[in-house]
Amino acid sequence: MDLLLLEKTLIGLFIAIIIATIVSKLRSKRFKLPPGPIPVPVFGNWLQVGDDLNHRNLTEYAKKFGDLFLLRMGQRNLVVVSSPDLAKEVLHTQGVEFGSRTRNVVFDIFTGKGQDMVFTVYGEHWRKMRRIMTVPFFTNKVVQQYRGGWEYEVESVVEDVKKMKESNTNGIVLRKRLQLMMYNNMFRIMFDRRFESEDDPLFVKLKALNGERSRLAQSFEYNYGDFIPILRPFLRGYLKICKEVKEKRLKLFKDYFVDERKKLANTKSMDSNALKCAIDHILEAQQKGEINEDNVLYIVENINVAAIETTLWSIEWGIAELVNHPHIQKKLRDEIDTVLGPGVQVTEPDTHKLPYLQAVIKETLRLRMAIPLLVPHMNLHEAKLGGYDIPAESKILVNAWWLANNPAHWKNPEEFRPERFFEEEKHVEANGNDFRYLPFGVGRRSCPGIILALPILGITLGRLVQNFELLPPPGQSKIDTTEKGGQFSLHILKHSTIVLKPRSF
């Protein structure tokens, strides 16, 4: 950084400290704010808390300051909710007041400042985008239309694994093949397209760009520049990379998928009774003037991030827990063999006949919640919560992982025990009927992808367990389940090698 920029930064910092001190004193007299660590001017609690706002760190603060606490991170107020009653207030009772999404410098780049559905503010644009996306993505009709494709994709995984010599000896990193499966599951829905192999050049390019987007957006590295505007010049290089990745991704979506589908529609007569893929519905909305081309591309962006990777994380966590708990794996396999018959492959309708499979999925989503803080909420205007004043445009984090892992609400929560959903938690479902358990959120801004994720999880875990014995690699009794948290993600740190021994029927 040159001396002139450094001088300007220091002068700005000095002025900001004076202004922040005055504003802080005025605001403290006016508001009854939630408890939290004592902030300092300009930096707030950032010097104490740091950039790593993962679910476990926030849980420790909840133990110290209570179920509702405030972190002042530079210019941003972060309000953290850690009880079922307060979660109900934010997500349901005051769902409109807290129904918006926060903005940050990186997500503004990747979403075109909220031109998508997931990260836009609550209002007319969100309602329009949700309506346009529901029919092609989030209905039971979609599940029935594409379940055969999902079953084919996991069957292909099983057959490919059986052909890999290493799979039943030293083991393989199964995630690589499952990633191809998940891309095919979602690209069938979006574009009626699939990739033939992991070596497909277009798949390799797409996967690399999506991976870089996830890394940049989920990293805690940029928090300091987002929280404290005076430090934002230090983020110039980071934000430049974000813009480059965004432009490359949107160009790839447009050139290879959206425009290709348009050409197909223009060159061959489309049967009006034929089943449409999602992009057909979305392009119709564009033709009617309901959305523009940028909105179309940001819808594709959302699905690439929100639908593919999150479900893949949950599949990977489920496999890891089954490897590390062989008695649970055996119990699940026995259920499938008993209910369906040995060798009869699990289909989507079968998953509803397999209660232990459903319990394994629920327990995976409880202990290893893919989005442990949900997607952050925001109140556009001043609000009340738990008897406290919440300043306008506060970032509201619901620590859904702690709701589902708090020993005050769950019996031995650190234990992976699917049986709890037959016993003391038999009435708890993943759809948000109990505010202790919100893997997909609940209310207006809940994740509509639940309708796709649950059947895909069921088919995938069911087929793998019935066709293979899943084991740690030679010399290990368990695989490593160390967590890697992100801005609001939770996935496994190391993509483990596992041994898959084929079963004979």
From Swiss-Prot:
Its EC number is 1.14.14.91. It holds the Pfam family p450. Gene3D superfamilies: Cytochrome P450. A motif (Nuclear localization signal 1) lies at residues 161-168. A motif (Nuclear localization signal 2) lies at residues 247-254. GO terms for biological process: lignin metabolic process. Transmembrane segments: none annotated. Heme binds at C447. InterPro entries: Cyt_P450, Cyt_P450_CS, Cyt_P450_E_grp-I, Cyt_P450_sf. It catalyses: (E)-cinnamate + reduced [NADPH--hemoprotein reductase] + O2 = (E)-4-coumarate + oxidized [NADPH--hemoprotein reductase] + H2O + H(+). Induction: Repressed by MYB4. One of its GO terms (molecular function) is trans-cinnamate 4-monooxygenase activity. It is found in: Nucleus. Its cofactor is heme. Pathway: Phenylpropanoid metabolism; trans-4-coumarate biosynthesis; trans-4-coumarate from trans-cinnamate: step 1/1. Keywords: Heme, Iron, Metal-binding, Monooxygenase, Nucleus, Oxidoreductase. Component of the floral volatile benzenoid/phenylpropanoid (FVBP) biosynthetic pathway that controls carbon flux to pigments essential for pollination or UV protection, to numerous pytoalexins synthesized by plants when challenged by pathogens, and to lignins. Belongs to the cytochrome P450 family. This is Trans-cinnamate 4-monooxygenase C4H2. It comes from Petunia hybrida (Petunia). The lineage of its organism: Eukaryota, Viridiplantae, Streptophyta, Embryophyta, Tracheophyta. The gene is C4H2.
